[in-house]
From Swiss-Prot:
It is an enzyme of class 1 (oxidoreductase). Its EC number is 1.2.1.71. It catalyses: N-succinyl-L-glutamate 5-semialdehyde + NAD(+) + H2O = N-succinyl-L-glutamate + NADH + 2 H(+). This is N-succinylglutamate 5-semialdehyde dehydrogenase. The active site is at E243, C277. The keyword Ion transport does not apply. It comes from Escherichia coli (strain ATCC 8739 / DSM 1576 / NBRC 3972 / NCIMB 8545 / WDCM 00012 / Crooks). Belongs to the aldehyde dehydrogenase family. AstD subfamily.
Length: 492
């Protein structure tokens, strides 16, 4: 029984799904997808639970969420192993994900009060108040690269605001989704407040097509995000928050410490085997001898990155990709770029057949026309050389995406120029593209999102504002508008 609907674990009525470790092939989880009727059932449960959950005080909802945080802490080792085994990422990185989930609780509580709490302003004849109200029933679509942390970034603020939820994990990480749901169950969530439906495309389509849905919170690919946007385009009454990918540029301008810059680049491009939406996909490198030296060092150090299994000792920097198919897609993308005229500096290699262990790839595309503006979701870095900083900014902005952008340079003036001209929601200076602050919004523009950033701003899309003018008594104004007559004289 792998679906959690209205406080009960039930068996899915859809197709059988089996999840294997992407490196070893070990069977980790199996269960049946939710069919359309069960998705409807989950929605009815969420709708029925909404009034009571929304009427609880914030402190009461906060208490449940904080119990969940405590359970995460006590079960950190077990959840770390589940996420690592299912995604293929190393144990150390899965542990940082669970830590981020724990930290998200306190951050979300604070963000609720700052972004969507209550405010009151006194007026001469009363007061003006601002409150926030939950939307109702929200669907949360989770991604596979951070199957605990990223859905958590939607679920926690949505629950705090008073919404009820139908959560569909990625079909590639059902075990992680179930493990997190069991912790929510232990935290004492009332039946129907959070429901879990497993499945792939058909389950997702049934969920997004629900009429009695007040909103959808999505993290995933741009293609799927565009499909959801089209599907809900005629329904402005439904909130839609899209967090999508990027074709992110990292500009290496002047480098004081080559090894430090190489380290930053590897952290930007290859952490999580290149499976972060903020990963650097395009390296824009200044022409000249220093750039040549940097590139040679980058290739040399990247060549030493050997992917390993989740529990290998010593621990590897990167593990496997989410699937063998995903790894093969990266290899295919590299082959296509090479066929277009790209110059391979480091060829990506599958370490063995029927696994997702893939070494990083680096290919120079300077002077090659018609390079697709697409996100390759894996450890493949494309390199372009530039002559002037103005040219670098033009190249950085030459994308339909707009998630992250970074600059390595000792010059504050150049960063200030980039801040003015960059088209990206995250712009970093001498910091990895994959780094983000929990007290800042996280999201992009263009094909990277729809102006509903998550993280610190997640509270914004989990509640709607209600403005009120208030007075505890009613009296006739001393001064009336022209044309109003309240005298006792009878008009004949």
């Amino acid at each position: 029984m792998t679906l959690w609907i209205n406080g009960d674990w039930i068996t899915g009525q859809g197709a059988l799904r089996v999840r294997r470790n992407p490196v070893s092939g070990e069977v980790l989880w199996q269960g049946n997808d939710a069919d359309a009727a069960q998705v409807e059932q989950a929605c009815r449960a969420a709708r029925a639970a909404f009034p009571r959950w929304a009427r609880l005080s914030f402190a009461e909802r906060q208490a449940v969420v904080e119990r969940f945080a405590g359970l995460l802490e006590r079960n950190k080792g077990e959840l770390t192993a589940i996420i690592a085994r299912e995604t293929g990422k190393p144990r150390w990185e899965a542990a940082t994900e669970v830590t981020a989930m724990i930290n998200k609780i306190a951050i979300s509580i604070k963000a609720y009060h700052v972004r969507t709490g209550e405010q009151r302003s006194e007026m001469p004849d009363g007061a003006a108040s601002l409150r926030h109200r939950p939307h109702g029933v929200l669907a949360v679509f989770g991604p596979y690269n951070f199957p605990g942390h990223l859905p958590n970034g939607h679920i926690v603020p949505a629950l705090l605001a008073g919404n009820t939820i139908i959560f569909k994990p990625s079909e590639l990480t059902p075990w992680s989704g179930e493990a997190v749901m069991r912790l929510w169950q232990q935290a004492g969530l009332p039946p129907g407040v959070l429901n879990l439906v497993q499945g792939g495309r058909e389950t997702g389509q049934a969920l997004s097509a629900l009429e009695d849905l007040d909103g959808l919170l999505f993290t995933g690919s741009a293609n799927t995000g565009y499909q959801l946007r089209r599907q809900l385009s005629g329904q402005p009454e439904k909130i839609l928050a899209l967090e999508m990918g990027g074709n992110n540029p990292l500009i290496i301008d002047e480098v004081a410490d080559i090894d430090a810059a190489v380290h930053l680049t590897i952290q930007s491009a290859f952490v999580t085997a290149g499976q972060r939406c903020t990963c650097a996909r395009r390296l824009l490198l200044k022409s000249g001898a220093q750039g040549d030296a940097f590139l040679a060092r980058l290739v040399a150090v990247s060549q030493r990155l050997t992917p390993g299994n989740w529990d290998d000792e010593p621990q590897p920097f990167i593990g496997g990709l989410i699937s063998e198919q995903a790894a093969q897609q990266v290899v295919t993308a590299w082959q296509q770029l090479e066929a277009m005229g790209g110059r391979t500096l480091l060829a990506p290699r599958l370490l063995q057949s029927e696994t997702s262990l893939l070494t990083p790839g680096i290919i120079e595309m300077t002077g090659v026309a018609g390079v697709p503006d697409e996100e390759v979701f894996g450890p493949l870095l494309r390199v372009w050389r530039y002559d002037s900083f103005e040219e670098a900014i033009l190249m950085a902005n030459n994308t339909r995406f707009g998630l992250s952008c970074g600059l390595v340079s000792p010059e504050r003036e150049k960063f200030d120029q980039l801040l003015l001209e960059a088209r990206a929601g995250i712009v970093n200076w001498n910091k990895p593209l994959t780094g983000a602050a929990s007290t800042a919004p996280f999201g992009g523009i263009g094909a990277s999102g729809n102006h509903r950033p998550s993280a610190w701003y997640a509270a914004d899309y989990c509640a709607w504002p209600m403005a009120s003018l208030e007075s505890d008594s009613l009296t006739l104004p001393a001064t009336l508008n022209p044309g109003l007559d309240f005298s006792d004289e009878v008009v004949r």
